[in-house]
């Protein structure tokens, strides 16, 4: 009997995987400590890998134009498992990560405009090639971007962190507050505002700069 229960216990903690077909979507929204890996393809799908639970514990459903990825049980159960979801997208315009989740790109994400939101200790690390990018981090969320985007808009608050030193941008608008931090590279036009302990560091030699700092905020050129 003990051996049987031990076998069941080991089986429940073994890694399980499942590949799912998905309806069309243009955005991805992930939460609850799930790691998501994005890859471009010809048809939308998701491969779920889980240790310490069942694949049925992981929800991958398209709501409107967004793919929602979360745990079926909203209680603290999800903190005891390890979940990775490999998402194949056709086109993507929006990425949202919260509650200690992470999003990574396998290859460069190409888009006209890309909207990125990161909050509650979540993390986004991606490579992009887009005409414009909007990044908003808060509550210890972190975004690290590389690649190219002529137009970049950054907002960071409540200890949110944005690092785009490796993202080539021509025009940048950055607003940082409440202990937020932004690191940016800009070549032509910079508008930067930092307040309430917010910190902005920029690289490059923009032809025009319009900066403002208040309440302990800081905007400085970096080496």
Residue ranges and their predicted role:
Residues 1-223:
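Intrinsically disordered, low-complexity terminal regions
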